[in-house]
Amino acid sequence: MVLCFPLLLLLLVLWGPVCLLHAWPKHLTRAHWFEIQHIQPSPLQCNRAMSGINNYTQHCKHQNTFLHDSFQNVAAVCDLLSIICKNRQHNCHQSSKPVNMTDCRLTSGKYPQCRYSAAAQYKFFIVACDPPQKGDPPYKLVPVHLDSIL
């Protein structure tokens, strides 16, 4: 039993950062958190845009992509044919046309002084969609995760 404790402690230490990466503020629905993280109809400078996300999580997010489109248009992608997500779930959907987007990558700093570089892109995207939660827009499915950029 003595040997199990250090191993358990190591697993907890390693699992902690993984949990932070996938957590969202519990007072928000997954769709609202998706909107905060990924929907930006008018491009903003990455340092400014990312501070809004980082203030929720209290750490510098390493990378984030902003889709320059409306939530309504991105939610409409959820009505397209389902495809397999990276996590092997079957609730992903690919956009039918490319959209403008900005990829923000952490270059330096520690929270709250996070600094980012920006790369403008025009690409297709894949989102995971789920039924709406209470408080979400009344769509059949809503985007909850940006699965990939193509």
Curated annotation (Swiss-Prot):
Ribonuclease which shows a preference for the pyrimidines uridine and cytosine. Has potent antibacterial activity against a range of Gram-positive and Gram-negative bacteria, including P.aeruginosa, A.baumanii, M.luteus, S.aureus, E.faecalis, E.faecium, S.saprophyticus and E.coli. Causes loss of bacterial membrane integrity, and also promotes agglutination of Gram-negative bacteria. Probably contributes to urinary tract sterility. Bactericidal activity is independent of RNase activity. The record marks 61 as: Critical for catalytic activity. The lineage of its organism: Eukaryota, Metazoa, Chordata, Craniata, Vertebrata. The record marks 59 as: Facilitates cleavage of polynucleotide substrates. The keyword Glycoprotein applies. Belongs to the pancreatic ribonuclease family. GO terms for biological process: antibacterial humoral response; antimicrobial humoral immune response mediated by antimicrobial peptide; defense response to Gram-negative bacterium; defense response to Gram-positive bacterium; innate immune response. It is an enzyme of class 3 (hydrolase). CDD domains: RNase_A_canonical (cd06265). Its EC number is 3.1.27.-. One of its GO terms (molecular function) is endonuclease activity. It is found in: Secreted; Lysosome; Cytoplasmic granule. SUPFAM superfamilies: RNase A-like. This is Ribonuclease K6. Interacts (via N-terminus) with bacterial lipopolysaccharide (LPS). GO terms for cellular component: extracellular space; lysosome. The active site is at residues 38, 145. The gene is RNASE6. Keywords: Antibiotic, Antimicrobial, Disulfide bond, Endonuclease, Glycoprotein, Hydrolase, Lysosome, Nuclease, Secreted, Signal. Residues 1-23 form the signal peptide. It comes from Macaca mulatta (Rhesus macaque). Disulfide bonds join 46-104, 60-114, 78-129, 85-92. Substrate binds at residues 61-65, 86, 105. Glycans are attached at residues 55, 100. Its main location: secreted. The keyword Disulfide bond applies. Coiled coil: none annotated.
